[in-house]
Structures are given as C-alpha cells and as structure tokens.
C-alpha cells in the first residue's frame, strides 16, 4: 500500500514526535560470549531454524485467544512480542527498543515499557498498537538520527544507532543494503518468514495456515558463538509454547528452559553431601604436627631489600604455641562458641592466635589496627568478645578503644602482647607492671591438646561485612566448610605438602583464612612477607621469586600490585586463587606474563558462603597462550566446586532456574554455608534460605551414631545463600556476574554497601538529598561517586569562583568547602575505601517519568571538568603557599588521579582517590620530572605533597641524588605522510602531454609494458599477443642483459603455461629498474622509446604488505612518475596504469559504499577523487598506489589520456586454472586445509580471474577517454568469504566451517604453539589482527569498465562487458591446478570431482623459479 509523502512541516512534526518517543531511551544489548570490539566491528553469520509443530500450534492457540479478547493480531505481532519478552529476560531491562519495519518496508523503532507482571495478552495488545503507531509515523532512519544528534549538547557523544536488536517480517524488511549499512552496531537481526513449497516468501501479517515458518538469525560472530544463537532460537520457540499455555499469566514466569539447557545447568534437587563433615581444621592440623613435627610450617621473611636470614617455624612449634594459648583461654572460662577478638598483624603470631582460639573451641575474629578507632569499636560492639588477644607486633590499642573495652565489654581474659620468639617460645605479656607473663601458668601444657570437641555446626569464625545502616554485619562461620573442600582442591589443582603458600590477604578479611588453613591442612609451608615487600610495587614479585612460592591467594587489587613494575619472573608459581572482586582478563595476563606457569583460578563467593565457592580456571600460558583471547574482559565466576551449586534464579518467579543468558539472582547452594549473622535473625532468615527445590526427606544422613561431634550437628539442612548478585548462565553452564540486585558493590576487593554510604551522607546536616553510584572512569576503573543536594548553608560556606557555563564545574567550585567537610565527616564513619572519590553537588536530582531518581541522567565529571575545578582552586590562593616542587607534584597528582578535586599540600594521596596502582605510576612520573631515583615506597611513607616535596628536595641536594638513565631514543627512519607527499610530488610530473592518436584495429602499434614477468603481467602479455599481428611489445625486465631479460620473461610465461614461441618475434626487452631515473634505461634507448611507443601499460610495482610507504615510494611512486615522463616525450601515448582497490581500503569508503547501495546505487563511483583515503590507509602498498593514482589523475588534467585500472583480488586463469601460489587467498585456501577449518566470514570477496583483469588493462590502453578516468574491476557476482572457502569441502577437502573467533584461536595455536609451518605464517599479522575487517571491501561501480570492454569487443569479437566472477566451477579449476603442481594435497573425502587440468613438464620446471605478483590482501 503506497503512502503520500508528508509535507516538510508534517515531516518535521513526525521527527519531533519520534524525538519525544525516544527520550531517555534504553538501548539494550544481548549478553555476549566475547568482548565487544572497540571500535565496533562486524563478522556476520547466519543461523536458520524451522519452527517445529508444537511452536506452530502454539501460535495458532495464542491467535485464537487474542481474537477472543478482541485483539487483532498476526503471527508476526505474536513473534515480535515474544522477542521483546526474551530481550527483557536476557537484559533485565524494562525499557525495550527493537528495530522493525512497516508493511512498506520502512524501518522504525518500536519502544515499549515492560513489567514481569504484565500478562502476555496485555503486552501483545500494546505491541500491536505501537506497531501501528510507528508504521503510520514513518521517517527516514538517518534523518531521525541526524535530528536527534542536532539536539545534543556539545558534551554528548552523537548517536550512531537507535537499536542493537532488530526483528523483521522478511517480506517487509528494509533492503539488504539498509540492513548492512546499519548493521555495525546491531547485535542480532531476526527475519521471520513463511516458505511455501514454491519457495516464495509469504507475509506473516495476513494468514495462519502455513507449512513452514522460518527464523533467520543474523548475528555478529565477534559477539556471539553459534551455540549461543542456537540457544536463543530455542528459547524464542519455547516462549511461544509457554505463552500459549497461559496467555493471561505474567510474562516474567513464562518458562524458557529447554532440554539442551538442562543438560549443562545444575540440578537444584541433588544431594550435596550435607553430612560429609571432614573434621575440624585445628584437629587436622594437630594430626599433621604429630605426623611430621619438624617439617617447616611458617617462614617469616625479611624484606628483599636487606640481606638477612629467614625465621622458620616447624609444625611442632606452631602446634605447641597454639596449645598454650588454647589452654589459657579454656582455663579462663572461654567456652565453645565464645568470641575471641584478635588485634592482629600479618605474621606468625596471627597463625598461633587463630589456631589457639580454635583449639579452645571458640570463635576467632580479627581487628586490623589500620581501621580507625571508631570502626574498631563498632566491630567490638557487634562481636561482644569474651576475650581479647593483642599481638605484640600489632602495636597498642588506641586509648578510646581501651576505654570502650574496659567500660562496655565483659572479658574473661585479656592477652596484652602475644609473641612467638624465634626459638619457638611463646609469651603473652603482663597485664600489670611486674606481674608474671600471662601465659606462664600453662606453658607446661604445650604438648597437650585441649580435647575440646567441635562439630560441623560449631562456630569457628566471625567475619565482618558491610551493613546497610552503617553497622557492619558479623558473619558466623561453620566448621563444616573450613576443611571440607581441601581434598577436592588438592586433586583438582595439584596442591600438596610440597607447596609454598603466601600470606598476602588482608588480615581482617575472610580470605586470610584460606591463606592460613590451606597449607596447614595439606602439611605445606606458609611464607610471610614484610609490609614493605607487599606495599612497594615491584618488590612483591622479587619476594615471590626469591622464596619460590608456588600457590597464592589474591584479590585483583593485590594481583595488580604483584605485577606492577615487576620485572622478575616467578616460574615457581603454579596456582593463583583470586577472590574478593571481579577479575579481568588484563589482571590475568599481567600475572601470567610474570609467572608463565601459573594457572589463574577465579573463585566466586562471599563471606557468607565461606569456602563454598565457584571456580573458573584460566590455564597457564605455558599450557595455552591463546585461552584468554576467547574470554570477555571480566572472567566468569565459573561453576561450583565439589558439591557447590551456583543457581541463577528467576527474580519474578523464584521457583524457576534461569535459562542460559537470562539475567537472574545468584544463589549458592552448598553444605558449607555460614550459619548466619550474629544477633540478626531477621536478616539471616532473608539471606540464608531453606531450598524449595528439593524434598529434604530423600536425603540420607550418614553421620556415624558414635561421632563425638554429633551434638554439634544440626542435621541435614538444604540451604541456599541469596547473594544479591545478578548473573547469567553461559552456554557452557558457567556463570558470569552482571551486577548487584541491591546496592552492594566491590571496589579493589573491599565489599561496600552503597546504602551504608548513603545513610551516613544523609545524616550530614548540609545534605538534603543524596545517592551514591559506581561509575567507570576513562580507564574503566570502578569509582564511587556521591551526588548531593546541599541545604542550610551560609554565604561563608561558599567558595568564591569564576562562574562557568558548566554546571558540574560550578558545583565543584562553589561547594568546595562543603565537599571537604563531608569527606572529613565520612572519615569518622567509614573506612577510607568506602569514601566516595568524587562528590558532585547538584541543585536537584533528575527524576525519570516514574518519579525515581534518573541514574543515567546524573552527570559523571570527566577529566576536563575536574581539572577545570582544580585550576580554579589554584587560581584562588593555593599557589601562593606552594613551593615550585610542590606545584609540580600537585600537577602530577591532578594528571594521574582521575577525580582529584581537593588537592592541597597536606592531603593524603590515598584520601583523594590514589591507590597502590596509581602510586606506582606516581613514582615513575616523579622520577621523570625531577630526574632523581625516587624510591618506589616513598608515597606510602610520605603520602602528602608536602612530604614528597621535602624528600625530593633532600634527594636533589644530598647523597641520594641519582640522575635517571632514560637511554637513547631509537633512531627511526622519519615517516612520510603519503597524502602530503603526493601534493609535493606534483611538481615532478610533466607540465603537458602531447595528444595521443586513436589507432585503428589493423594499424601497427607498439606497447611498452612494465611488470611483464609478474603474475598479472604474463596474462597481460598473452592478451596483447593474441590481439593483432601488427602489435609489438617492448617489455621492461630487471635483468643483466636483454638476452637474460627475454629468458626471464619466457620462463615466467612458461611457468604459467602461456608461452608461445611465435611471440618471440613480436617481443623485445629492455633492462631496467622501476626505482631508478628513467627506469635505469640508457639514454639512447630511452630516446628511441619516446619516439616508437604508442601505448604504455604500467603494471610494474613492488608488492609487499609489511613494507612502509617510504620503502615502496621509489619503485611504485617514482616509477609511476617515470611512466608519466615517458608519455610526455616524443609522440603522443596513452597510459593504462594498474592500481589496486587497496586505495579505497578505509572505513570512509566502506561507509560511503553502504550509503550509496542503500539508496539503490552500485557502489563507489569511478569519478571519486579518493580524498576519503588521503589518510587512514594502513599499508605502505596501498599508500604508494594512492599517491601514484593521484599523480596520474593530475597528469590527466595536463593533457594525458589514460585509464587507472583498479582490480581487487586477482586469482587464476579461467581457462587453464594457473594461479599464483603466493596470493593471499591461495594461502588462505592452503592454510584452511592445513588447519581443517575455515572461518565463517560473511563478507563478500571481490576476486576476478587474472585473464579478465588482463583484458581490462589492455582494453583500457587501446580505448582511452580524454583525460584520465578510473576503471573498477569488480566481480559479478561476488561470493562471500565463507562460500569461497566452503568450496573446499564441496570438492572433498577435509575442512569444516568454524566460528571466526574459534578459527582464529585454532590458527594461532597451530602456528605458534605447535610450530607448524603454515601457509599463512607470512601473513599471520594480517590474519590474526582482524581478518573480517581487513577483507571487508566496498562495492564498486564499474560503468567505465563496461563501456571500455564494449568498445573493445569490436577489436576482439568477444564481449566481456558484463564482467567475470569466481564461482564454484572456477574454484574447482584452481584447486585442481594447485593439486596438480603439488601445492595442495589431494582431497581425501567424497565430494565433487575436480576438473582435469593439463600441465606439462616445462611448466612444472619453471614454476619453482617464476616471479609473481600476488593478489592484494587489501583488495
């Protein structure tokens, strides 16, 4: 149905309506298998599925139900609605935008808001209405994007797309050109159609009786695996069936689980060995000590910067000293389950204290002296300990803490200064002056265990996590978990008594328990570093290597510190277990580059799950260098360890496990969960849940009746911990985390509850409203940003500042005093890591249509805004108080700390957003600036500008001065800007050209040919020789003599089977070199050439895909200038110049091609002046051809007649099959046969037979226009890359289609890991870099070429103006030729028979030494 075009006024009104419809639009992305490439790249693939009978029946049932409710629907409406539901389930978004089109194939955006509680019929009705509304208000897609971009502020990035997901009725879909033009930023396009037996597409908008319904999913292989797309199709069909069963039920509860998914996902009903208690960790340790008392247990190391011996403690010494403390606790009334608080430091005494508390049957908890006293008091108030153990080396308690302990706690005992001496003797300190050591009375019991029995449900640990009301939560651990998983881990990760573990975790964080208990369980060693070795970047790696550590537990932040500025490898390290925060691919790579043998194990869990965690292994680079290439930037959480399940549960209907890709909440189901929260039964009941999936009566309790610990076993409890994390299942069954269901987050390993920060902020008297978010800065680092609306301020509270147009900068300036005050206030309430790095004052909070704070609309200050605010601060009085050194240091801080706004000389580097990683960068910036060897640990001891400046001044003037040797810069050949060089070279081309004559077909002609003995040159020569008896060819050949030159030419022709002895009479040779002046031809011969030559075919060039422009400039550019010079002298001559489509190898021309073809054009016009590639060409060869073309076209303006011939890939002869084995595509063919795989790349390939290209070149020489024109040589039709390589299996070669990412990884393994001499090795950089993008070519208009070939048909009696192509027949011919010459093996599988080719012995003999010009890998 045609529609009348709207008036300009109506059209603008439509654009305004669309602008309103798409306001604050959420553009959803589907979950991917691979990281999104930046910038966007596309490797298209297609997956097709025919609807099964149950899905077709379900469509009819929905249709009938909708009709009964008066909803006029079509099958397409139903499927579109199903797709919207699936997208919402995959993304968690409630604002869904899908690209679709009207019945007139006009694309538009269908945007709908969706709630899980919506009924299917209600949503279906809404979608139908929105589809009608969008169809009737159609506008051009590009016009809409331009209209929306025109409304953006200068700070906003322009929109490139309006949707990432598209769903079309195939007959109504926009043109294929539109789909490809707009496809770069699209995740998935679904085309739905009905196929009749006639194979004609039938619309889904009108009928329900159909034989076959087809889904065609077009997806980006750089984002999705085929298995993922297969599952998406399954889920789409499953949702159709589910909806048909309950059209009025909530869409959030629709089942999308399929048998395929169930095979890889955990079964939430299985027995997880609930009664499999392994024993208490302290008893296992005591048993180990009895078995091997003299084995090394704890090794305390000195700093690597000093030469001192280690202090080593045996299992007996740790066992005996912990017995002493345990007996002291028991004799002072400590009972099973009492909390003993340990004021600790990282060292052997902590191990003694922990094991002593456990042996007493008590619960240990740790306070870190680094916490502010107020925070320590909070921990004490929550724990209510009955004993306090202070480690002597941890320092003394703060007076305020001591006062709290004395007034508020009822301690049974207090150990003031626990210390294990180097000889193994233990002291506890004296509680009063002159009194005996507090442990004196139990020293005689050191060899005796306490005998206190604990069971799986006894409480060994009390660990703290962030709380929502400003009060930390105390998590009560259980003994079950502490030892249960170690046997499995030892087997799975090859851990043993020979290992040397590290003690690197934060002492008050529960990961420290892994550090201690793992080696003690295994009978291994625990190596303890100094604080200096941990805190000084680069030093920790030295320490790890020096002491040959083999296993470590790290947070990602600690891993970054280990790898930062490290240059000493750690070959001994074989496993690194990461916990506590998201682990990135970059984190893994940094560590694995340092430790080539380390397997990185990402472990997902929480304090509440104790040792019950998931795991995902990144194998060592010594085993698999390519593994990380297929991983996304964030490493998955993986799957549960032995008898641990990660259940991703539907948030709307918790009775359902989520399908693969569906976002849900992560629950951990295991027997090793913690007991709950101390003193908070209500929260415990919300987070530790009895499983509703299984019948507990079917589980068997295998606890022995006589087990002494049975009284401390609560029986089988099938429990799950509700993590609050959002996640998804991957197609493998692994889980990836995708955010938080609440506001709890982790930054640098610390778990932070945003609610806690918001609570404290809201209590500040000058804060009316506030919200805290996590944003990613320009380096993708998570950053805490607090937004506040100030209140109750006086004029004196405002900082004077010059007004700026930027409201963010104004706020940061105006409220600087308030920001500083809030920061100081939060320091008294929160640990430093929980204080927002950026505080942004606002006049009011932006609200969304639902009346909630519009989080996406909150401004995130960028670097320039923060710098502007800081500059303003500097201008208003700060500079006057800073020395020159201090000013320089401040400037460095502002440059490297992304969000520093309140920088003064006394501010701590770490308080304003610095951390250990940035500290490393700071030190090197200081070294570079001041040319002194600033110690790497200086910022930790002097974290202020003032302190750093004093130390640097001292170094500059004193003994420590050490000018840095920054080395000499490598001498480089200066780069030449090819576009500018072309302009400069115009002066070298002749000022004018004599007019060439149009000779008749029978008139004598002399052709000068360069590159005659190259691959294409051979076929150009053959084409010339078969044209006329009155034609002579003078060939330029690089040789020692004319005789030698003729032999070389003859050998090349013979090698490709084209030589005819009769040619010798019509061919003469001149010796020369393209790079030399006049090609090195002696003057007499040069002068003769100017008088006898009628046509110049300049085909010669140095083809190399790595050489820079500067190396190719001589033969390719200066050689072309020589050709122009020859044309300008003597008689008039026309020029046929062989260029390459590598001159249009830029994104500009790909986009221009898409734009032209989307409007019905044929592609890049031959008249285009190529300014779109005057920069951004990436190969020196393409650049040299661009400059040469430019000069030839300039010569055309000065009278030259000629044609620039622009071919793409030049493949074999369509008659004989002879082909250049050094061609890129031929190497691809051989490489894929070697690998047994070929990549699924959907790009079209512009490849043409060599004989057709030769015909275009010669025809262009004989039929030039006035001036210089371009003749594109393009394939008609073009095969796609996967079709081209797919012919291998057609003809019986053992190759299989592979997803591109998998093919790329397999190739890299094949070439690098297995050291195979692949045919692709010389081009590996090109293939592995980005083959799909490198092979993506613009479409080309070839009008000029067609006209030239039509004119030439009267000379040759053969009309080839319709072009040529390489299809299955030609590929068979080429493959047969390559087999015949021994380049390829014979096919081994059944397939089409290769056509017969005839190759004589002379050809085989000469082939080995033939010169060749390969087809361009850049077209």
Curated annotation (Swiss-Prot):
Cofactor: record remark: Binds 1 phosphopantetheine covalently.
Compartments reported by the entry: Cytoplasm
Gene Ontology CC entries for this record: cytosol
Annotated catalysed reactions: (S)-2-amino-6-oxohexanoate + NADP(+) + H2O = L-2-aminoadipate + NADPH + 2 H(+); (S)-2-amino-6-oxohexanoate + NAD(+) + H2O = L-2-aminoadipate + NADH + 2 H(+); (S)-2-amino-6-oxohexanoate + AMP + diphosphate + NADP(+) = L-2-aminoadipate + ATP + NADPH + H(+)
Primary enzyme class: oxidoreductase
Pathway note: Amino-acid biosynthesis; L-lysine biosynthesis via AAA pathway; L-lysine from L-alpha-aminoadipate (fungal route): step 1/3
Top-rank taxon, per record: Eukaryota
Pfam families membership: AMP-binding (PF00501), Condensation (PF00668), NAD_binding_4 (PF07993), PP-binding (PF00550)
Residues the record lists as O-(pantetheine 4'-phosphoryl)serine modifications: 916
UniProt cofactor(s): pantetheine 4'-phosphate
One GO molecular-function entry: phosphopantetheine binding
Record family assignment: Belongs to the ATP-dependent AMP-binding enzyme family.
Physiological role: Catalyzes the activation of alpha-aminoadipate by ATP-dependent adenylation and the reduction of activated alpha-aminoadipate by NADPH. The activated alpha-aminoadipate is bound to the phosphopantheinyl group of the enzyme itself before it is reduced to (S)-2-amino-6-oxohexanoate.
Protein name as annotated: L-2-aminoadipate reductase
Organism: Schizosaccharomyces pombe (strain 972 / ATCC 24843) (Fission yeast)
Gene name per UniProt: lys1
